[in-house]
Regions:
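Processing junctions and N-termini across compartments
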Residues: 20-23, 61
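Extended, basic/helix-rich recognition subdomains
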Residues: 248, 257, 306-307
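N-terminal Sec signal peptide cleavage junction
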Residues: 26-29
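Conserved catalytic-core surface of thiol
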Residues: 335, 340-431
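Active-site nucleophile-adjacent alpha helix/oxyanion-hole segment immediately C-terminal to the catalytic cysteine
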Residues: 43-238, 242-247, 280-288, 292, ...
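Bacterial N-terminal signal peptides that target proteins for export
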Residues: 2-17
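Active-site-adjacent substructure of cysteine-protease-like catalytic cores
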Residues: 166-169, 266-367, 430
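Short, low-complexity, disordered segments immediately C-terminal to signal peptides
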Residues: 33-46
Length: 431
């Protein structure tokens, strides 16, 4: 169905129990190679898909475990592009920098910086620190598909945290010293450091949500309220112009986000009826050409050469390297009662999309925009859209073997049980 989000420029109240689940899912993000940072990229590859009907920003490639930030920036770029018809190249590195800073400054770090997270964390970071274009943070990576700077910064910061100045700065809770060490790890130039200081202070005495309520921060930093988006007010509402602040809403200690247009996490149920109900909500959002974030568990032995995640293949090969992941749901393929196959990437009429909401509809796969790069012959030979993957519902429903702590188990008996790969979706209010 042509409800997906394409046109690529470049070639990853909640209950307390769900909060615990989200925290465990935030342990890291899967990347398509053991060490993506070891693979050089010139960022020049590109692909366009002219069949699809909704604008999406370009595919990028994560080099560390921050898929959730790549997914969130893809989401906000698509929302913005729907309103402006222009493509922002926002900086995942910017949000990554602040994610590390908050861990260090708040004493929430062990022997290494945690790279994993989830949507709620990303939304809070955006509200506090805004977004910047990549060219205004890491200039050398303004057009790069993959950020090597993130990988080198993580290595440098962890070394300093282990036995260098960062270890002492964290122990003293010296925010200015923590920022100074992060600036060095990220190899920020003097002009970039000065602009950050001007807005937030050397010791981060200010954040956008508190100090810049009535005035723009300037210095290339955009508040969420400065980023226009286009979105529908609920499934039966009208398309309206809004801002990214409306979509991120306001967080709470319970994990829910408040606001008329706020997106919230919706867990994937365990029963068939509940699953179909949630999938219908996802379909409605995609029908309205709005991107949907989704969290799922990757097992790379399920990845086929044509960019599918297949339960049949996983059952043949047994469990492999695996981990949590977040991507942007983009399109789906389904068999619809009375109609037959609605194929991904092909135009569907309003009547067909309405029929696809029937209880008896069988979704075959969900197509996602990923953060593993566009052209990856080392991992797959072909894909319907470069950089996108088709997650078969049989795989997402599972169950699959759960092997915590085993990077690539050679003995399935090491696995402690089973897990449902599909974890949750992030949906707008009213759906």
């Amino acid at each position: 169905m042509a409800i997906d989000l394409s046109h690529n420029r470049w070639l990853p109240a909640l209950s307390l129990s769900l909060l615990a689940l989200a925290s465990s899912a935030a342990a890291g993000c899967s990347s398509a190679t053991k060490d993506d940072a070891a693979v050089t990229e010139d960022g020049s590859g590109s692909s366009n898909d002219d069949i699809t009907s909704v604008n999406q920003s370009g595919v990028k490639r994560q080099s560390i475990g921050n898929c959730w930030l790549y997914a969130t920036t893809s989401w906000l770029e698509a929302l913005n592009k729907a309103e402006t018809n222009t493509e922002l190249n926002t900086s995942e590195s910017w949000l990554t920098y602040w994610h590390w800073y908050e861990q260090l400054a708040n004493g929430r770090v062990g022997t290494e910086i945690e790279t994993g997270g989830w949507y709620g964390t990303a939304a809070n970071l955006i509200n506090r620190y805004g977004v910047v274009l990549e060219k205004d943070f890491i200039k050398l990576e303004a057009e790069a598909e993959m950020s090597n700077r993130q990988s080198s910064a993580l290595k440098a910061a962890n070394e300093s945290l282990k036995s260098g100045p960062l270890k002492d700065a964290v122990a003293r809770r010296d925010r200015a010293a923590i920022r100074k060490e992060l600036d060095a790890a990220w190899q920020l130039d003097a002009d970039t450091v000065a602009r950050i200081d001007a807005v937030f202070g050397a010791g981060v005495e200010r954040t956008l949500d508190r100090a810049f309520v009535n005035a723009a921060p300037g210095n290339g930093i955009l508040r969420a309220r400065d980023v226009p988006i286009r979105i529908k007010i609920g499934a039966a509402g009208q398309l309206v112009s809004a801002t990214l602040a409306d979509a991120t809403g306001t967080g709470s200690s319970f994990g829910t986000r408040s606001g008329r247009l706020a997106f919230n996490t919706v867990a994937y149920p365990s029963d068939a009826a509940g699953r179909r109900a949630v999938l219908k909500r996802v379909q409605r959002v995609l029908h309205d050409q709005v991107p949907v974030l989704m969290s799922w568990k990757v097992d790379f032995n399920a990845l086929t050469q044509d960019a599918h995640f297949s339960l049949d293949q996983l059952n043949r090969l047994g469990p492999g390297r695996h981990g949590g992941h977040m991507t942007v749901a983009h399109d789906y393929q389904a068999t619809v009662p009375g109609i037959g196959l609605l194929a991904a990437g092909e135009t569907a009429t309003p009547a067909q999309m309405e029929a696809a909401l029937a209880d008896g509809t069988k979704i075959e796969f969900i197509r996602v925009k990923n953060s593993w790069g566009g052209i990856r012959p080392d991992r797959w030979r072909d894909a319907a859209i470069p950089g996108y993957h088709d997650l078969e519902m049989a795989y997402l429903d599972g169950p699959i073997k759960d092997c915590p702590g085993e990077d690539a188990p050679t003995d399935p008996s090491q696995c402690v049980g089973t897990v449902t790969p599909l974890g949750d979706f992030v949906l707008p209010a009213g759906y």
